[in-house]
Amino acid sequence: MSTIKLSQKVRVSDPCYDNDVWCKTNLSNVYPGEYNVEVDKTDLGDWGNRISRLTVIHKGYVVECADESSWTPHSDIGVDSGQAGIFCESSYRNDELAAGITTPPLDRPFVIPFRNEGDVWYDKMCNFTLAGESWGAYDTGVVTSSGIGDGSYPLDVVYNDTDEIVGIRITYLDDTEDEDEGDCCGVCGGEIEDDGECAYCCD
């Protein structure tokens, strides 16, 4: 299992965003320490295996965070580059730190103009999410591709007894919604009946 180290201040954001963008979240009451990284994937058929959830949990609060009722809605995370992550504030868009980040090799490397401060770091994050696993971590941050693309995704947290955050979770795909919707026809998208036939296509 991968781990990252977080300080009291944490940025949860699409890595393409600078400080002027509103649809990011700055957390200032995170319990400092080492966090376990959990990346869940969901098989979406023709869409392939997509990342459905990114979770980081303080190593001292694994049991507490295992209780689903302990998670509290916090905010929504905007995504415009098909990826998002959880980063120690000191490392976010830090080009100097990026020099020490190793990313998987790509057959067709992602190339950006490097016009703005933070672009060297951003390039490394893109290389993580474009690689086969669609995510990656460095000492003080983790980034993943965002389910099936851009949008707004819920951020949930867990607090300890002193109101410090000890668990952080971004949900890209909600499995419970898929279960409620039932099977869909591959031709028209209509719901499949109990007899296995589509009421629209089979009339």
Segments (PLM) and residue ranges:
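Cys/His-rich microdomains that often coordinate metals
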Residues: 192
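Cysteine-rich micro-motifs
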Residues: 195-203
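Extracellular/surface recognition and adhesion modules
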Residues: 186-188
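Intrinsically disordered, low-complexity acidic regions enriched in Pro/Ser/Thr
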Residues: 1-180
